[in-house]
Swiss-Prot record:
Pfam family, any one: HAGH_C
Cited InterPro entries: Clx_II_MBL, HAGH_C, Hydroxyacylglutathione_Hdrlase, Metallo-B-lactamas, RibonucZ/Hydroxyglut_hydro
Keyword Glycoprotein on entry: no
Cofactor(s), by name: Zn(2+)
PANTHER family (alphabetical): BETA LACTAMASE DOMAIN (PTHR11935), TENZING NORGAY, ISOFORM C (PTHR11935:SF94)
Residues binding Zn(2+) 2: D67, H68, D139, H178
GO MF terms, alphabetically ordered: hydroxyacylglutathione hydrolase activity; metal ion binding
Gene Ontology CC annotations of this record: cytosol; nucleus
Enzyme class: hydrolase
Keyword terms, alphabetized: Cytoplasm, Hydrolase, Metal-binding, Nucleus, Zinc
Superkingdom, natural source: Eukaryota
Name of the protein in question: Probable hydroxyacylglutathione hydrolase SPCC13B11.03c
Amino acid sequence: MSFQILPIPMWVGTQDNYAYLLLCEETRQAAIVDPAEVNVVMPILKKKLKNKEIDLQAILTTHHHADHSGGNLNLKKEFPHVTIYGGSDQNGVSHVLQDKETLRIGNVQIEALHTPCHTRDSICFYAHSSNEHAVFTGDTLFNAGCGRFFEGTAAEMHIALNAVLSSLPNNTVIYPGHEYTKSNVKFASKHLQSEALNHLEGLCNHNQFIAGHITMGQEKQFNPFMRVTDPELQKHLGLNDPIKVMDELRTLKNQG
C-alpha cells in the first residue's frame, strides 16, 4: 500500500499557507487538508476529478483559523458528499474527531492527534500505510519552529511536540501549515549549532518549498522547540526546566 501527497501552496497576497492533497494510490480515494483558498484549490480538484485521477472523500481541518478552514463551506457546496473532519464543529466541520480516532482514505489509515495549544481544537493528522508515514501538523509544528500559543500554554505545546509528535516513527514526513522555514532557521541558529541545522539552511537556499522534505527524526535534531531538554540549549538560556525553556523560546521568537 502507498499514498501520494501533493503540496498546494496557497500564497495569495501575504499568505504562505499550504493545502495538501492526500491520495491512496490503490483506490484513488483522496482527502484535501486545510483548503482555505478556494480560488487556488478548486481548479486543481476539478481538473483531477474530471480526469478521474481522484475520488474526493474528505476535508481534513487542522484547526478553526480562517487561513486553514476558510474554504470548507464553499468546497462542501461544490462537493456535497464530502465529509469535513476537524477538532470542533466550526466552519462546516461535520465530524468532530476524538483524540486518536481513526478514519480511512482508501487503504490509508489516518489518526487524529489532539495537540491543543495554538488553538483548543488543533489536530495533527497522522497518515500511514504499511510502508509510509506522514503527518499534517497545521500550526502546531513547523520545520524548525512551532505555532504561537494563542489558546494554550508552554506546557501544552511541550506535550504536543515532545510527547505526541516526537513519538511518531522517525521516518514520518512532516507537512506543516505554513512555509516559515527560512525565518525559523534564522531564529534557531541563534540558539543551536548543529550540522543538521546547517543542512536545513542549505535546503532552504535551494528550495522555495520545504514541505515534505523533512522527517520527524531530522526535525528532532534541529528544532529548538523539540530540544528543550538539551543541556546546551538550557545552559544557553540559563534555564533547566523544559517548560520554561519552551516558554522562553516562544517569547523570544514572538519578539522577532
